[in-house]
UniProtKB/Swiss-Prot annotation:
Residues 255-265 have a biased composition (Basic and acidic residues). It comes from Arabidopsis thaliana (Mouse-ear cress). PANTHER family: CTAGE FAMILY PROTEIN-RELATED. GO terms for cellular component: cytoplasm; membrane. Residues 107-130, 175-195 form a coiled coil. Its main location: cytoplasm. Keywords: Coiled coil, Cytoplasm. This is Kinase-interacting family protein.
Length: 297
């Protein structure tokens, strides 16, 4: 038998076992009161799991010690041979039960380690998923804020667009009114131009008429002067002094010179007045170029 052949392990004291059991009870009460969190489960995995394993190991050592003592005591205490069969059967049953308990404790230890590792991995995955979910929620909130700002910007742009459309319509109305005014002014300018042309024609016609009248008056004056010359000649022939004839001739010359000078002055005054009457066209008729003037001379 392996348990009897191997040296007995050193068992812990009863007070040590009680203290460790008390720690396990307190930790169990704390878990029931506060609930399970990731930090508590990690603390349990790294601190309380070794304590539980050590308690299981102590329990196994205690069972091994009790089995060894039980195997030694029946040979010394019990003197009857009739009970040997029952002792052997009970010993075999205890050995089998102890082996089953040993196997079950090992399996339980492995199962506990597997469960703890699964819990830790599940909690890590849960925390990772929660962190990813929080980041996605933050991204979603930022996207919602951005969408709200974009909506406000679109509303402002629509308002500016409406204002620009109204301003464009007002400018279009102003442009049409200015075009109409321009057309009216153009028509008025054309009318004024036609009226100016008519006025210029009238002025030219009046100037020609005045010039013809003036030439006719000059001709009449010249005829009157020429009709008076024979009378002066007859009077000069009756006189007997040659000095008087010379004086008369000089007087005639002076009169003719003054007559020509006064005629020229009058003609120049008339032409100046006619030139100042028409502001649009200049006079193309001058005293020297007029055929009537030459005829009058």
């Amino acid at each position: 038998m392996d348990a009897s052949q191997s040296p007995l392990p050193q068992l812990p004291s009863l007070s040590d076992l009680e203290s460790r059991m008390q720690v396990m009870r307190v930790s169990a009460l704390d878990d029931n009161q506060t609930g399970e969190t990731f930090s508590q489960r990690a603390e349990w995995f790294y601190q309380r799991s070794p304590l539980l394993l050590s308690l299981c190991q102590d329990l196994y050592d205690g069972y091994a010690t009790l089995l060894d003592r039980f195997n030694q005591n029946p040979k010394q205490v019990i003197p009857h041979d009739n009970d040997t069969d029952t002792d052997i059967t009970s010993e075999v049953e205890s050995i089998l039960s102890f082996q089953q308990m040993e196997v079950s404790t090992c399996d339980m230890q492995k199962n506990i380690e597997d469960l703890v590792s699964q819990l830790v991995t599940a909690n890590l995955e849960k925390d990772t998923a929660k962190h990813i979910l929080q980041r996605r929620e933050q991204t979603l909130q930022e996207a919602c804020k951005t969408i709200g700002l974009l909506k406000k910007l679109v509303m402002l742009l629509d308002m500016e667009k409406e204002v620009a459309v109204e301003e464009t319509a007002n400018l279009g109305h102003k442009l049409t009114s200015l075009l109409e005014e321009n057309r009216e002014l153009a028509s008025e300018a054309l009318f004024m131009k036609n009226e100016a042309v008519k006025l210029a024609r009238c002025v030219l016609k009046m100037r020609d008429e005045h010039f013809h009248k003036m030439c006719h008056l000059q001709n009449q004056i010249y005829e009157l002067q020429s009709s008076r010359e024979p009378v002066y000649e007859n009077e000069s022939s009756q006189s007997c002094f040659g000095l008087e004839n010379s004086k008369k001739k000089s007087k005639k010359r002076k009169m003719s010179e003054t007559r020509s000078e006064t005629g020229e002055k009058m003609r120049s005054k008339w032409f100046k007045r006619l030139n100042t009457i028409n502001p649009f066209t200049k006079c193309s008729i001058t005293p020297l170029s007029s055929p009537l003037y030459h005829a009058a001379l």
